Amino acid sequence: TNYLLINIPDYSLVAIKDGDTTQKQRVVVGKKTRQTPVLESKISNINLNPNWTVPPTILAEDVFPDAIKDRNKFNKDKLKIYNWKKQEISPWEWKIEDANKYHYVQLPGRNSALGLMKINFKNKYSVYLHDTNHRDYFKFTYRALSSGCVRLEKPLEMAEYILNDEENWPLEKIQDTTNINHYIKLK
């Protein structure tokens, strides 16, 4: 049996293949107010260069309060605002009264909240494994710093491990693919 085991209090992940630990890496987990849930699931797919649709909790607790003070928050964070017709709305047209009527999307890139890669699995918490734009966090001893998702220290190596397809998806190809900022869904 092959599986990933995340030890939340130890801030670590191990990959187990046929009973042997084949990979170990540091992770960042949810902070005290937005803890990473304990769950068991099966990986459904891997996204290279993913867009990030900002979840309601992060909008309400982080984005909206900052945007009220400074509309340029959307531009600084490279967030696009879309109405229900999928038309882009200017940050200067944005009003807090209408804030929940819109979708907020961060385009892919090394500095996006999801970084270069996201691993999806079914769960009721809307959490996943992903890269990060805060790579410096892995130097810290205390790493309960995310909004619930698990951030990976070596995300592209984990993608290679999960894909297990050296012929079609070696690490070099995964790295090259993330350099072009083109969204790709795998597996």
Please describe what each predicted stretch is.
Residues 1-187:
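Well-ordered beta-sheet/strand-loop patches within structured domains
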